[in-house]
Amino acid sequence: MKKRQSGVLMHISSLPGAYGIGSFGQSAYDFVDFLVRTKQRYWQILPLGATSYGDSPYQSFSAFAGNTHFIDLDILVEQGLLEASDLEGVDFGSDASEVDYAKIYYARRPLLEKAVKRFFEVGDVKDFEKFAQDNQSWLELFAEYMAIKEYFDNLAWTEWPDADARARKASALESYREQLADKLVYHRVTQYFFFQQWLKLKAYANDNHIEIVGDMPIYVAEDSSDMWANPHLFKTDVNGKATCIAGCPPDEFSVTGQLWGNPIYDWEAMDKDGYKWWIERLRESFKIYDIVRIDHFRGFESYWEIPAGSDTAAPGEWVKGPGYKLFAAVKEELGELNIIAEDLGFMTDEVIELRERTGFPGMKILQFAFNPEDESIDSPHLAPANSVMYTGTHDNNTVLGWYRNEIDDATREYMARYTNRKEYETVVHAMLRTVFSSVSFMAIATMQDLLELDEAARMNFPSTLGGNWSWRMTEDQLTPAVEEGLLDLTTIYRRINENLVDLKK
């Protein structure tokens, strides 16, 4: 993993296409071709999990299941599972530059239900049965959870009126399996569609020497099959409800901190069974990704624990995490893994020591590097080779939005001097050039920055609800000039993927 190369951060949902959201269809294959032509090595994406009401890929109904929004409908037509006429007149949203999650949910569900029904008439049922058998440990749990959740008007399991269902009593589960058999089939088969399409796309990328950098949230949602099945692995009360939740302490950016709301792991309980759940989670992740970025890595050293019911993150306290014991157990079971540690935020010597002991590369965000009054740990001149340098991530503004709206004149002047920006050079190009010229072995540009887009293209604004995760690229934005610019930076700063082969005809 440590050869000097580069890549692009572009989530699946942001790919162009006709059906309201990016998918595993032709535009995804075209994006791989774009990466090949520009001599990249890495395609970084956000988590692929099934998203909840806020549309965040970091709040999923399962740590293992995939987001069925990404199933490509044209592929289902090619497979005979849908008719082209089924897609005519369906309202997937009217703006090609953003995702309307409510519209695509209501538009896609009946289409996928139709495809599932048709699958048992014309599909490869034996292949599906093998998939179901191979993934039984999480698939049955997820299908049961979603079926019962839908039966109870999509309430989280902690709010279900049936106490026996909440407690997973065998008799209750058996009754719901019979009563909701069609829903169980729907969720099993759509997961099959998801993984069948994704693994084919990943194979195409890998065949062309492009590696997929996936993303793993450290926490799971309370409204998830994982917590429903394993309340003993979380800090909960007798009813299975979280007694404390995750977040970040107050800092210079937020006087009340960040209140994420995820349940906190009971690390003592996980330690007793040898971290089996984490080992399985990582094992499954490396079946679908080549490299995994683990979000909020510092939480493994110590994490901010907030009493459940708090209005802000301020009442929390730091609590020690599992430290190296977790990664030692993972290494013993799975061997060396290509992991990137998202080590942003409040850093201590202990967190740095843990990251260095694991050997995982950390992250550097160039937008954080420019402080005219003081040193920044994100400064390129301080970055070790074993790091990943970004213009920004999904949680940052675009470079153009940041430059215009988030920094003062003194910082703009310092940034111009530091990057040696020329009069004829755009701000975004100067930042991209600085990232690609850094010593970090991996340089990652966001697609929005390659397109030099403003704050309207920002992916997420942390600690806000609504309006996030919706940006999409349109087909006309990826011009030859954009391609040439990326290839030029990649060539000048010796980040060319030398393993590339000619695209298959």
Swiss-Prot record:
EC number: 2.4.1.25
Coiled-coil regions, chain positions: none
Family note: Belongs to the disproportionating enzyme family.
Swiss-Prot/TrEMBL catalytic activity: Transfers a segment of a (1->4)-alpha-D-glucan to a new position in an acceptor, which may be glucose or a (1->4)-alpha-D-glucan
GO CC annotations on file: cytoplasm
GO molecular-function term, one example from the UniProt record: 4-alpha-glucanotransferase activity
UniProt name for this protein: 4-alpha-glucanotransferase
Subcellular location, record wording: Cytoplasm
Superkingdom classification of source: Bacteria
Classification via PANTHER family: 4-ALPHA-GLUCANOTRANSFERASE DPE1, CHLOROPLASTIC/AMYLOPLASTIC, 4-ALPHA-GLUCANOTRANSFERASE DPE1, CHLOROPLASTIC_AMYLOPLASTIC
Protein's organism: Streptococcus pneumoniae serotype 4 (strain ATCC BAA-334 / TIGR4)
Keywords: Carbohydrate metabolism, Cytoplasm, Glycosyltransferase, Transferase
Presence of keyword Glycosyltransferase: yes
Pfam family, one: Glyco_hydro_77
Broad class of the protein's primary localization: cytoplasm
The gene coding this protein: malQ
Swiss-Prot/TrEMBL GO biological process terms: carbohydrate metabolic process
